[in-house]
UniProtKB/Swiss-Prot annotation:
It is a multi-pass membrane protein. Pfam families: Proton_antipo_M (PF00361), Proton_antipo_N (PF00662). InterPro entries: NADHpl_OxRdtase_5_subgr, ND/Mrp_TM, NU5C-like, Proton_antipo_N. It catalyses: a quinone + NADH + 5 H(+)(in) = a quinol + NAD(+) + 4 H(+)(out). Belongs to the complex I subunit 5 family. The lineage of its organism: Bacteria, Thermotogati, Deinococcota, Deinococci, Thermales. One of its GO terms (biological process) is electron transport coupled proton transport. It comes from the Bacteria. GO terms for molecular function: NADH dehydrogenase (ubiquinone) activity; quinone binding. One of its GO terms (cellular component) is plasma membrane. The gene is nqo12. NDH-1 is composed of 15 different subunits, Nqo1 to Nqo15. The complex has a L-shaped structure, with the hydrophobic arm (subunits Nqo7, Nqo8 and Nqo10 to Nqo14) embedded in the membrane and the hydrophilic peripheral arm (subunits Nqo1 to Nqo6, Nqo9 and Nqo15) protruding into the bacterial cytoplasm. The hydrophilic domain contains all the redox centers. The chain crosses the membrane at residues 1-21, 29-49, 75-95, 104-124, 126-146, 165-185, 206-226, 234-254, 266-286, 303-323, 325-345, 364-384, 397-417, 441-461, 492-512, 584-604. This is NADH-quinone oxidoreductase subunit 12.
Length: 606
């Protein structure tokens, strides 16, 4: 029952704030919501330290409501509630004075409750409840300022695109049920230790579940919703689109590693999609001018790295990057929020610059976040990214092509990370006046996230240094044999990874301080700003034709129904008109008789 309590605590916050939040004064709703998330973190940590926990209750015939806290789900619980708590505290200051203050924290708590349902689920239907729940909560949070039509449209777009992936999730569950008669993750894991039932159909189930992950984690081709999701308040971007919801797809693959480890072709497809998405996100980040959209495309790219790791079979490495990414990406979003707060809502990086001297604490948060993203040696992002690069060469579904592609993306990542930092904090001031530093309630969470961005990678250092995370996670994951590199080869790859990161950071720092750019770069930047016209292509090839078809069907239905109901109306009107002729006066009938006879004679003569 205590395990269920980790979900019920934030759910209680949602209920209390939804019912009584308007009667509470600031900052009480934020304090209450943050306190309940912290309580959930402490409860989950205590259960994990005591050896894990289970909860099971009757739900549907043959489908119990089952929860499991093992090392994998416990690891995700600590990320969701730990980083989530810091973002809640930050939002107390960021959302101050907003008329929807209590509503915001109600939605925030709902999201945490649904995310915990997703990660603790021991069956796919229970996971799907959390899956849909975080989709609903993200819809409410992205469209939080719903009176702005553009923001409301962005929320709908995110919701609809994710439904495509959700359909894949449901169909995948249906196939697994048909094959094995159960959707319990623990039971399926045991069943697949023996001979596989219908490998082709099982591969289709794996692809369909992967489609669900593609939608939730914004992978090619369903990545178009995430940049538009920046319409929500900045803490929403940090919580949902950096640390938690968008990594749900990676978690689904890791939790289903018993399935994907026996499907090499599907795993290879996952790795290919991951690498392509990593490259697409990195290239698209260069042209963005919105401070949050640069970080959003970076998120797409980093999620691609995670899928690449999971695809080659390095499930624990993918989760390692989930962990480090939660810190430095949340830090980048919240540092962006502090900049937006300092500039009175301005988000265009072309109107920034020179903020280094005005924001003495936020500048360090931003620098640490950018360097961790860029893979500066010894920061957390370096260790997890290096582990991904090494995994492409040592795990069974990897290969040299994956390594080279990931290495090139690492250079691009370091360059656009420096572009973001240079445009915002360095150079001359452009278009802003009297920026002010964020209040302490917004700075302290960033201090802790910055600390995590530096230190989180030290949980899994390369051989022969200590690696705590791999032995902690591996018992909950499928066993995939990886061949080990020699010590010299391993550290040679680390040196190459470090050199590539330093080269990219230096090149980005130098190149983006220029005032005039070459023509080739301006052409590339223009295409990058439009994300290489993918959205436009989708609108032209899919959205607009479907919209035209829907409108044609609508007007066709309306005309058909109007005609159908019009026949009855016409008969009724005719009857009412004829009824008026029945007056009961003999002279009227005589007149009508004479007129009818004359009409008949006229017709006969004609």
């Amino acid at each position: 029952m205590a395990l269920l309590g980790t979900i019920l605590l934030p759910l209680l916050g949602f209920a209390l704030l939804g019912l009584f939040g308007k009667r509470m004064r600031e900052p009480l709703p934020g304090v209450l919501a943050s306190g309940l998330v912290l309580a959930s973190f402490l409860l989950g940590a205590g259960l994990l330290l005591s050896g894990g926990a289970r909860f099971q209750a009757e739900w549907l015939p043959g489908i119990p409501f089952s929860l499991l806290l093992d090392n994998l789900s416990g690891f995700m619980l600590l990320i969701v509630t730990g980083v989530g708590f810091l973002i809640h505290v930050y939002a107390i200051g960021y959302m101050g004075g907003d008329p929807g203050y209590s509503r915001f924290f109600a939605y925030f708590n709902l999201f945490i409750a649904m995310m915990l349902t997703l990660v603790l689920a021991d069956s796919y239907p229970v996971m799907f409840i959390g899956w849909e729940g975080v989709g609903l909560a993200s819809f409410l949070l992205i469209g939080f300022w719903y009176k702005n039509p553009q923001y409301a449209d962005s929320a709908r777009k995110a919701f609809i695109v994710n439904r495509i992936g959700d359909l894949g999730f449901m169909l995948g569950m249906a196939i697994l049920w048909a094959l094995y008669g159960t959707l319990s993750i623990s039971e399926l894991k045991e069943a697949m230790e023996g001979p596989l039932k219908n490998p082709d159909l099982l591969a289709l189930a794996g692809l369909l579940l992967f489609l669900g992950a593609v939608g939730k984690s914004a992978q090619i081709p369903l990545m178009v919703w995430l940049p538009d999701a920046m319409a929500g308040p900045t803490p929403v971007s940090a919580l949902i689109h950096a640390a938690t919801m968008v990594t749900a797809g990676v978690y689904l693959i890791a939790r289903s590693s018993f399935l994907y480890s026996v499907l090499p072709d599907v795993s290879y497809a996952i790795a290919v999609v991951g690498l392509l998405t990593a490259a697409y996100g990195a290239l698209s980040a260069f042209g963005q001018t919105d401070i949050k959209k640069i970080v959003a495309y970076s998120t797409i790219s980093q999620l691609g790295y995670m899928f690449l790791a999971a695809g080659v079979g390095a499930y624990w490495v993918a989760l390692f990057h989930v962990f480090t990414h939660a810190f430095f990406k949340a830090l980048l979003f919240l540092a962006s929020g502090s900049v937006i707060h300092a500039l009175g809502g301005e988000q265009d990086v072309r109107k920034m610059g020179g903020l280094w001297k005005h924001l003495p604490q936020t500048r360090w948060h931003a620098l640490i976040g950018a360097l961790a993203l860029g893979g500066l040696p010894l920061l957390s992002g370096f260790w997890s990214k290096d582990a991904i690069l090494a995994a492409t060469l040592t795990y069974p579904f990897g290969g040299v092509g994956f390594y080279v592609g990931a290495l090139l993306v690492a250079v691009l990542t370091a360059m656009y990370a420096m572009r973001w930092f240079v445009l915002v904090f360095l150079g001359e001031e452009r278009g802003h006046h009297h920026p002010h530093e964020a209040p302490p309630v917004m700075l302290w969470p960033n201090h802790l996230l910055a600390l995590g961005s530096v230190l989180a990678g030290y949980l899994a250092l390369p051989h022969p240094l200590p690696n705590v995370l791999e032995p902690f996670l591996k018992p909950a994951l499928a066993e995939v044999e990886a061949h080990h590199l020699s010590l010299g080869a391993e550290w040679g790859l680390i040196a190459l990874s470090a050199a590539v990161a330093l080269l990219g950071l230096w090149a980005g720092f130098v190149f983006f301080q220029r005032k005039v750019f070459p023509a080739w770069y301006l052409a590339f930047e223009a295409a990058s700003r439009e994300a290489f016209y993918v959205d436009r292509a989708y609108n032209a090839l899919i959205v607009n034709p479907l919209k035209a078809l829907a409108e044609a069907l609508f007007y066709g239905d309306r005309g058909l129904l109007s005609g159908y109901f019009g026949l009855g109306g016409a008969a009724r009107s005719l009857g009412q008109g004829l009824a008026r002729l029945q007056t009961g006066y003999l002279r009227v009938y005589a007149l009508l008789f004479v007129l009818g006879a004359l009409l008949l004679l006229g017709v006969m003569r004609w």
